[in-house]
């Protein structure tokens, strides 16, 4: 993507680490680009957007959403041709030592070739426009990506109500 980046990151048990990581990443990338181009501007126009993802039900869906993003934007014909994607690694076309595989990907098969084949079939299979829209909307609004049960669990853990609402202020009651 020319104007944004998608990262699927597991902050483990410390979600605040995500903000620290993004601050450092933004600062380093901005300084690098500014020194390269002889400028003194900001690089990113706004704060990063994040959406906690329910691993079992939605992590693979989110991976497919990210892998197919450059294809849907007509930047490449096939996901494996996007040089910034993990797709080519996950289907065995190339290798990257720094890439960590998530538990859902690893759980696709006991063998590496089985995982690669299953993941390729999953990504190239019929994606649900409704799920893609749900993922996109959750990301745009920085809301949870998952089932109602997942939302309930997070509400209980946080001790506050979490509701996925549309954009804007609620209408006043008459």
Which residues make up each language-model segment?
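Short Pro-Cys-Gly-centered "Cys-loop" motif that presents a nucleophilic cysteine in a tight turn
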Residues: 1, 10-174
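Glycine/serine-rich anion-binding loops at beta->alpha junctions
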Residues: 4
């Amino acid at each position: 993507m020319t104007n944004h980046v998608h990262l699927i990151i597991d902050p483990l048990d410390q979600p605040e680490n995500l903000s620290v990581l993004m601050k450092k990443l933004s600062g380093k990338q901005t300084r690098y680009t500014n020194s390269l181009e002889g400028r003194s501007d900001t690089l990113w126009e706004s704060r990063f957007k994040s959406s906690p993802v329910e691993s079992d039900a939605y992590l693979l869906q989110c991976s497919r959403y990210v892998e197919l993003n450059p294809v849907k934007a007509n930047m490449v014909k096939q996901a494996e041709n996007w040089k910034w994607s993990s797709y080519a690694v996950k289907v065995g076309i190339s290798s990257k030592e720094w890439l960590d595989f998530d538990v859902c990907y690893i759980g696709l098969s006991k063998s590496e070739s089985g995982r690669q084949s299953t993941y390729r079939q999953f990504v190239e299979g019929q994606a649900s426009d409704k799920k893609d829209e749900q993922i996109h909307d959750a990301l745009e609004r920085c809301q949870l990506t998952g089932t109602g049960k997942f939302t309930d669990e997070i509400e209980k853990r946080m001790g506050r109500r979490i509701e996925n609402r549309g954009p804007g202020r609620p209408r006043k009651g008459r």
